[in-house]
Amino acid sequence: MTLQWAAVATFLYAEIGLILIFCLPFIPPQRWQKIFSFNVWGKIATFWNKAFLTIIILLIVLFLDAVREVRKYSSVHTIEKSSTSRPDAYEHTQMKLFRSQRNLYISGFSLFFWLVLRRLVTLITQLAKELSNKGVLKTQAENTNKAAKKFMEENEKLKRILKSHGKDEECVLEAENKKLVEDQQKLKTELRKTSDALSKAQNDVMEMKMQSERLSKEYDQLLKEHSELQDRLERGNKKRL
């Protein structure tokens, strides 16, 4: 294996390792969000898009070169099989055909996993943000609910005080009671708004989960199509034999 293909194979193994780490169930998206928020990522963010596109271009070039090599040695393979003047040419061509097919798979999967890795990081970041917003809205709803209960308890206390005191303080207590009722209504309105926002955040999280499931299905479909293409290529090689 030449130096360039050894580097591509190492890059492929690194991609597989990162994808497996991202898919670990016991690491929450919020933890990944904290890792992605490090200052070092902000410093290299300006070069990230350029590096991403550069790697894609390099992998596409290597993939097309591997396709060219496969087609080249597949055609030569048929010619040298019928020739008896060079008995070692057939084995030599078979070896080169095997290497070109190996390089084709390495470059193809490296390109595919590179795109999957970019999409996976984006989905993890979006999911972490939605979960954070959900937690904030839930905390606000709980605080509003506690405040509403507190005002209701104070209202009950004022009612008991009104019964125990004489009619002289009745007007003042009624005014305070009315004010507390108004505050209670305001808090209920805020609680309703917060509950609606929390429901919206939950719907957004469900949409993110559905989008992640669709991406997983598309990934499985691509692997299935790649296996079918590989089987067809192997059957074509067997027919040439």
Swiss-Prot record:
Species this chain originates from: Pongo abelii (Sumatran orangutan)
Return the GO cellular component terms, semicolon-separated.
Answer: endoplasmic reticulum membrane
Q: Which GO terms describe its biological process?
A: apoptotic process; endoplasmic reticulum to Golgi vesicle-mediated transport; intracellular protein transport; protein localization to endoplasmic reticulum exit site
Membrane-crossing ranges are 7-27, 44-64, 104-124
Nuclease keyword on record = no
The segments annotated as topological domain Cytoplasmic are 28-43, 125-241
Keyword match Transmembrane helix: yes
Location in or out of the cell:
Endoplasmic reticulum membrane
Print the keywords alphabetically: Apoptosis, Coiled coil, Endoplasmic reticulum, ER-Golgi transport, Membrane, Protein transport, Transmembrane, Transmembrane helix, Transport
Biological role stated in the UniProt entry: May play a role in anterograde transport of membrane proteins from the endoplasmic reticulum to the Golgi. May be involved in CASP8-mediated apoptosis.
Which PANTHER family does the record match to this protein? Answer: B-CELL RECEPTOR-ASSOCIATED PROTEIN 29, BCR-ASSOCIATED PROTEIN, BAP
Signal peptide start-end: none
UniProt lists the family membership as follows: Belongs to the BCAP29/BCAP31 family.
Chief subcellular location: endoplasmic reticulum
> Composition bias, kind Basic and acidic residues: at what positions?
206-223
Region called Disordered, residue ranges:
193-223
List the Lumenal topological domains: 1-6, 65-103
The short motif Di-lysine motif is annotated over: 238-241
What is this entry's stated membrane topology?
Answer: Multi-pass membrane protein
Q: Indicate the segments annotated as coiled coil, or none if absent.
A: 166-233
Name of the molecule in the record: B-cell receptor-associated protein 29
